[in-house]
């Protein structure tokens, strides 16, 4: 049964497919479908992973707002395979992936799907897209991710007008995105690094100088979706 409100629950998944039929490399379509309305947001990436998930979700949020819940499978991008630490066991919490941690900071509930059948709406979407969208990309002669993303951005509004449905309730439960640059600080990879006595840290096998002298044993390094580091 569908949720009644737009923004209440969004299904997310990645479809690995030969989207360009040999005109370019195989890639992944990261797709979001609203459970109440079947409205679709989608974007192509070269792989399904944390940075593509964060980048696509950030773009979704900037267009529609922050949903209440996200439904995803047990891919390690979404669900951490790690065993709980002693501290987590004592606190009654579970390990989180970087993406799961970001959703928690945004107040989004991450719901795990235990089978493809549980993600019926997004699975049916991919069946449709692997037919309809592949044909559209073929007609346009598209063979790169960059060109495909420009095409999909222009094509999806007409697709949604045709196939989205009216939700049972009119209220949209999406919330505004965080003000300022907070979204960039949340949807990023956060890693704790040991702060040396000379105020340097080692990250990705590189030595970095911390400009502001702080009294701490560790600092948090942020790898952002745009490739910058803070």
Where are these regions (language model features)?
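Basic, flexible linker segments flanking DNA-binding modules
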Residues: 1-18, 86-94, 172-183
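Mobile-element integrase/transposase regions
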Residues: 1-40, 48-58, 62-68, 101-105, ...
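Short, charged, surface-exposed loops that flank catalytic or proteolytic processing sites
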Residues: 13, 136-151
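Residue-level detection of beta-strand-connecting loop/turn positions
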Residues: 24, 74, 204-205
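Generic short beta-strand
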Residues: 30-31, 42, 219, 229
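Short small-residue beta-strand/loop micro-motif enriched in glycine and branched aliphatics
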Residues: 38-43, 111
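RNase H-like two-metal-ion nuclease catalytic core shared by retroviral integrases
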Residues: 70-74, 78, 85-132, 148
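C-terminal, beta-rich DNA-binding module of retroviral/retroelements integrases
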Residues: 153-230
């Amino acid at each position: 049964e569908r949720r009644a409100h737009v923004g209440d629950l969004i299904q997310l998944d990645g479809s690995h497919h030969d989207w360009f039929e040999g005109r370019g490399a195989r890639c992944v379509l990261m797709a979001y479908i609203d459970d109440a309305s079947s409205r679709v947001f989608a974007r192509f990436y070269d792989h399904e992973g944390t940075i593509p998930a964060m980048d696509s979700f950030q773009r979704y949020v900037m267009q529609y707002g922050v949903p209440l819940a996200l439904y995803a499978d047990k891919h390690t991008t979404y669900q951490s395979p790690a065993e709980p630490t002693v501290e987590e066991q004592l606190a009654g919490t579970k390990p989180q992936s970087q993406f799961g941690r970001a959703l928690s900071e945004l107040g989004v509930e991450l719901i795990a799907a235990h089978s493809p059948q549980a993600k019926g709406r997004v699975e049916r979407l991919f069946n449709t897209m692997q037919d309809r969208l592949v044909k559209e990309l073929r007609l346009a002669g598209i063979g790169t991710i960059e060109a495909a993303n420009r095409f999909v951005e222009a094509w999806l509004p007409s697709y949604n007008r045709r196939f989205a449905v009216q939700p049972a309730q009119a209220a949209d439960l999406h919330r505004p995105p965080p003000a300022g640059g907070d979204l960039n600080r949340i949807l990023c990879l956060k890693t704790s690094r040991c702060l040396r006595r000379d105020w340097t840290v080692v990250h990705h096998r590189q030595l970095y100088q911390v400009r502001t002298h702080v009294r701490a044993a560790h600092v948090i390094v942020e790898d952002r979706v745009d490739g910058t580091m803070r």
